[in-house]
Amino acid sequence: GLYGACALGWTAVQGAVAAPPHLKAVFAYMTATNYYRGWTYSDGVFELGFQLSWVWTILARDTISRLGLEPAARAEAERTLVEAARDVRGSARHLPLIDFPAYQNGAAPYWREWLSHPGYDDFWRRVDAVARADRIKVPVLHMTAWYDTCLRGHVDLYSALQLRGDKQVRDQHRFVLGPWDHSAYYNKRPSCAGQRDFGPAVMTGPDTLAPLAFQWFDYWLMGKGDAFMPESKVRYFHMGDNVWKEADSWPPPHSVVPYYLHSAGQANSRAGDGVLTTEPPHTEPTDSYVYDPFDPVPTTGGRSMIDVLPGVENQTQVEERQDVLVYTTPRLAEPVAITGPVSVTLYASSSAADTDFTAKLVDV
């Protein structure tokens, strides 16, 4: 059996794709499956904050130790990394990114490769487990979280196995989606994601994950017990009412409800006139804002793994900015359940040579 989280989870997933004859089952959690989509890039945008901090805190330090540098040169390379890590936001301002100073001493040779392949091409395809999911022939249990950096990769792997896996793989495939962040397997606050405590029903960490792993592998490797094999293939935590639910597919059976952006042309900040409703707009003015790349909107909570806390965080300071357009529904008359992927169709133009548009769904 193969088991692991994060980097070790990569090994488990890639091992499943390699399909060695002795492999009988896999349990992978909080890990990437497609190293382009949702890991190095998100919808074509380089994951700058995450990649900077991940590379210098984990990868580059190990690489430097293997370069055979003289003591003085090694100390200088490590000092450069430490200085960069002390100021993630300041380091992120360096242009061009491909010439990031801390990585010019051999500490991260892959950095230039990543930035040289901004689109999904053969460079990424050759290590994409999702694209090769049809090669997986063993039972797979994989687990991620709403606030995990790797959420998208797990959802993509689930879809790929259900679409392209053979019947036995589909029947034996199980997916768990909890309310944690990426550090759930060693978190000192195992029921929390950011500022929200979801209660004892979501406790995770070694004391919870180890029994689950033993149960899974006892069944598939030793023929003991009933494994983690409920009839439903998906177990997910429904935030808001804070309960675990089960479904036969992901996303669960649902209806798509489109919401539309409205304003009188002044949707800037939470004090603006932006409104979100299910009524299509007619003739309305455009909303605009001034984008300053040297004063970007800060990452606040969410699926992050950088120098800010992931999970549920207060968005007030973000929504008070004039370069953020805010559209809010009227007070809800009854609870609304939102489960599954959320997408935005945006019509926009910009005078900037290069810019990105992002959208965030926030519980008010």
Cite the ranges covered by each PLM segment.
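Acidic catalytic loop of the alpha/beta-hydrolase fold
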Residues: 146-151
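Catalytic cores of eukaryotic secretory-pathway lumenal/extracellular enzymes that build
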Residues: 12, 22-28, 33, 126, ...
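Active-site-adjacent alpha-helix of alpha/beta-hydrolase-fold enzymes
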Residues: 152-173
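Glycine-rich nucleophile elbow surrounding the catalytic serine of serine-hydrolase chemistry
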Residues: 4-14
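Short beta-strand immediately N-terminal to the catalytic nucleophile in serine-hydrolase-like folds
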Residues: 2-4, 29
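C-terminal, loop-rich substrate-recognition/catalytic regions characterized by aromatic stacking residues
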Residues: 74-102, 185, 190-364
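Short beta-strand/loop motif that positions the catalytic acidic residue
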Residues: 136, 142-144
